[in-house]
Amino acid sequence: MLKLLLGDPNTRKLKRYQPIVEEINLLEEEVSILTDDELRNETHNLKSKVSLEINIKRQNEKLEEILPKAFAIVREASKRVLEMRHFDVQLIGGMVLHEGQIAEMKTGEGKTLVATLPCYLNALTGKGVHVVTVNDYLARRDAEWMGQVHRFLGLSVGLIQQDMSPAERKKNYACDITYATNSELGFDYLRDNMATEIEEVVQRKFNYCVIDEVDSILIDEARTPLIISGQIERPQEKYQKAAELALSLIKAKELSKDGIDPEGDYEVDEKQRSCILTDQGFAKCEESLKVNDLYDPQDPWAHYITNALKAKELFVKDVNYIIKKDEAVIVDEFTGRVMPGRRWSDGQHQAIEAKEGLKIQPETQTLASITYQNFFLLYPGLAGMTGTAKTEEVEFEKTYKLESTVVPTNQVRKRQDWADQVFKTEIGKWKAVANETAEIHRNGRPVLVGTTSVEKSELLSSLLFEQQIPHNLLNAKPENVEREAEIVAQAGRSGAVTIATNMAGRGTDIILGGNSDYMARLKLKETLMPLLVKPDNEHKPPIPQQRSSKAGGGFASKSESISNKNSKSSGASLFPCQLGEDTTRKLSLLSNELVKSWGERTLTILELDDRIATAAEKAPTEDKLIQSLRDALSDVKNEYEKVLVHEEENVRKAGGLHVIGTERHESRRVDNQLRGRAGRQGDLGSTRFFLSLEDNLLRIFGGDRVANLMNAFRVDEDMPIESGMLTRSLESAQKKVETYYYDIRKQVFEYDEVMNNQRKAVYNERLRVLKGSDLKKQVLGYGDRTMEEIVEAYINPDLPPEEWDIEQLISKVKEFIYLLNNLKSTDVSVLSVEELKNYLQEQLRIAYDLKEAQIEQFRPGLMREAERFFILQQIDNLWREHLQSMDSLRESVGLRGYGQKDPLIEYKNEGYDMFLEMMTNMRRNVIYSMFMFQPQSEKETKS
């Protein structure tokens, strides 16, 4: 009713932007007549205007004022550099982002290009802008691709990658616009707050941030906190023994009901992802280990056995992790990518290593942690883009105070979403997927099949291999990851078949007919790699797979490509045509020229990639070699384009890209993202989901209703089932999962918010120390508080002075400050409580000046160094212990719900008391350490 009366709020919002769009369009002609240098000069002028405003409110008002001009400049630069002009709807998207909202834009509507508008505008403040993507590959691609616009306009562009040194990171964070992944930003923030020198801090103060695929980062990954940990020693034989024992234990067929254990040694709750020993299992373990109690604090076993059971039942090889170079490497469940260097905590990773017979790495202890929710809330300006925000609108608003606005599409969507096909068994489903893939492939249409794990992608790959369907595999296995750009470049070609794990989060458009720009880059890389790249670097990435001569298109199967790896023609048929004689000769001359200038086999793969990427830009360059490389790229691209334009036409006529989903995801949003890969920018396309009653989602969350349905349907495994009741069960299962995970995220956020206030206080204190301004004043402040606390602990103001325990008080003060050894009870016996505090604080200051004079005799400046060292040492040690205590508290407060107490309130109250105690201990320890500090000369140290 309200909607009818007031109209759609989204439409009202969009109307508000229309006059500004018209103003930008009017400026287009004025800006288009400027030369490149004049356009760059406009950046300088706008920067000057914004920097004149010191007040943040006035600065924001100035940004609003110059927005039309800034957007018009970016649009013009993009036309010149990328040959891409921002549509009106993209200008609206830019305004939505600038206002700190989430812009929902469908796949293929140019989200990446939209981000250039608010990034340029907010970079004019000189405070830095962060563009956040889900993986290193996309961060690099966007920095190279969209970074051209910013560099052309005179802004500096930085890129953060996983293997960068601190010095490189610092340099890149200092740029006007920095592209990075969410995890790199988060870990750098935590590392900065563990730095011992201000020079080690790599990040600047946060200003404005745009998150690409915002739902993936702020919602899917919000359940898992970022943790930096240090090693602690635990007996390795316990992990091995527990893994052996877990194999001998028998899983119960059902869960316990009404407190009655089922038959078996342990039960598995897949929904809660937990394993629990039954009474029978406890007895069996205690007998096998010859112990009386698995929870004995002197010899604990329960934790090891539970982890071993979880490793056996819930952590599946090639789904949750892969084995790479004798290590268990985590696979990100949302992006399907490996996460080298990341480990599961609480001994879970060690349990998996024991299960797989790998070398067991030492266990770790948390040194610093933060959730993505609290991390991104540190940015004063936060915005995001996604193809699917409306499904999670409530969560964005409640947790992040972010509004969502749906930006209209530039062209009408022509995609067809075909009805789901549901099968009784998984085997039946996979056969049907293989058959539909084969049929669409033979019609000359490209097919993208989304799978949920490495294991499933390889199962489908083997089924297609049996049918002799050439295809490409894109999953977390290293040999496939390295070929990502190449696989995606070809995925839209006629008859191409691509199997991808969790393609939804990959953020790469599939261009019908193939991507001539990427193919030209790959051709150059293939030509130059044997001549310029160091031999030990040569294997990465492998030579591109060849096009298959069988079937009407597609690509060679894995086995074919391996057998051809060393043949000279290996890469030839990957590309749409053989290059003409003229272009081939030019490439040969260029290769010789580059070898002379850059040296034979002296570059790394990354360096060669960088140079080809720079050549692919249109920004002006004075480097003649880069210019020659640019000309060669242009020639190759033009030749490929002539062929691909016909291929694109054929693919369009055949019906465009067909997307197949092989399992419903936990969230409807991720299913919609996968569908969105087809039918970009008004292209034709189609999608279909194939499901089975044995799929995880239905099995875990579908309940008894689905189990009964399985028995009710007496149909063959390869016969699709259609039933209204089944469709409703599916939707209800998905809603159940979404609600379940939302509750988990909400709980993670509420508990971490308690930690967040404490974290901010500790990190602010650390930063003050690192900056080193007035360390003496800070330590004396600690001393004043300590003296007050000692007086309050030993003196009861309600008692008469003659009953005060002055002797004990004096003794305690001397414990902290040995230089006050001459202090006597008679000196203070006539003082009131306030006078006593003031007197002791005065004495502490005199003693501290005396101590400083002693220390400074050794070396001038040593006292300040000691102050910094002891404060940081105490903060870090006590914070680490505090994190452990808070973890233990969180585990234990859950049980208080049984006593009618709210666990969260209990956690807040006790956590606050523990934090106050930690800060008190920190102050006291610093004072004690400073007075006990006795520097040694080098002679003393050597002796």
From Swiss-Prot:
InterPro entries associated with the record: Helicase_ATP-bd, P-loop_NTPase, SecA, SecA_CS, SecA_DEAD, SecA_motor_DEAD, SecA_preprotein_X-link_dom, SecA_SF2_C
Coiled coil spans: none
Subcellular compartments: Cell inner membrane; Cellular thylakoid membrane; Cytoplasm
CDD domains named in the record: DEXDc_SecA, SF2_C_secA
GO biological process, one term: protein import
A UniProt-annotated Pfam family: SecA_DEAD
Cellular component per GO, a single term: cell envelope Sec protein transport complex
Membrane topology field: Peripheral membrane protein
Family annotation (PROSITE patterns): SECA, SECA_MOTOR_DEAD
Keywords: ATP-binding, Cell inner membrane, Cell membrane, Cytoplasm, Membrane, Nucleotide-binding, Protein transport, Thylakoid, Translocase, Translocation, Transport
Entry-linked SMART domains: SecA_DEAD, SecA_PP_bind
Assigned protein family: Belongs to the SecA family.
Function: Part of the Sec protein translocase complex. Interacts with the SecYEG preprotein conducting channel. Has a central role in coupling the hydrolysis of ATP to the transfer of proteins into and across the cell membrane, serving as an ATP-driven molecular motor driving the stepwise translocation of polypeptide chains across the membrane. Probably participates in protein translocation into and across both the cytoplasmic and thylakoid membranes in cyanobacterial cells.
Protein's name in the database: Protein translocase subunit SecA
Organism of provenance: Prochlorococcus marinus (strain MIT 9515)
